[in-house]
Amino acid sequence: MSRTNLFLLLLVFLAGTSCNKQQHFISDDAFRAEVEKDFQAKQAALPNGNLFSVFNQQMTPDEKEALTFLYAYMPIGDITDYDGQLYLDNIRSSFRARVEMPWGDSIPEDIFRHFVLPVRVNNENLDESRMVFYEELKDRVKDLSLYDAVLEVNHWCHEKVIYTPSDARTSSPLASVKTAYGRCGEESTFTVAALRSVGIPARQVY
C-alpha cells in the first residue's frame, strides 16, 4: 500500500471514529451514571400514571440527558403537576440560546446545567416564559458582551415590571408581565427567568 493511500485510509478511519463518538450533555461518565441512577429511583418512587411519558418522544441524546437530569432532581410536585412537554420545550429553548447567543460556548457545562437549564426559580407557577422572553430579548442582546447583556436584560425587566408590595404568593414570570408589578421576590424570580431565557446563568440569592 502506498504512503498516500495509507494516509487517506487513516483520515477515513479518524473521521469515522469522530462521527461515532457520541457527544454528551453531561460529559463526565461517573456523574452521568449517577444522574441516571437517581432518575431511575425517581421513576420507581412514582410508578402510577404516565408521569414520564415525555421520554417516549423522539429527541436528541443531549435533550434526553438534560431531561433526565431535570427529572432526577426536580421536586416531585413538578413532575406530577406539569406536563413533560413543558420541560422538553424549555430544554430546546435553552439549547437554542446556547447556540445563538455569543456567550453560549463560554458558559461551563456544570454552570449551564444548574443555573440556565432549570425552569423553576422559586415557588412560582411554571410557565412558558423562557420561550416568550427569548423571542423578545434575543435581538436586544445578541450583539452585546455578556456584561452588557446582563445590564440590558435588567433594563428590559424594569420596563416590564415595577415594585409593588403584595401577598406571600409568588407569581409566575408571565403573570408578572401581565400585571406589570411584583414584590421583591417576584421581581427577582422574573429577572432570573429573563436572564436564563437568553442563556445567562442566574439564581436568587438570599
Feature-to-residue mapping (PLM):
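Bacterial Sec-dependent N-terminal signal peptides
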Residues: M1-I26
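N-terminal accessory/pre-domain segments preceding catalytic cores
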Residues: C19-N154, S166, S176, S197-V198
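Cysteine-centered nucleophilic/redox motifs
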Residues: V153, A180-V205
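Amphipathic, well-packed alpha-helical segments that form the structural scaffold of globular domains
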Residues: N154-H158, I162
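Surface-exposed patches in mature extracellular/periplasmic domains of secreted proteins
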Residues: T164-S171, R203-Y206
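Conserved short loop/turn motifs at secondary-structure junctions
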Residues: P173-Y181
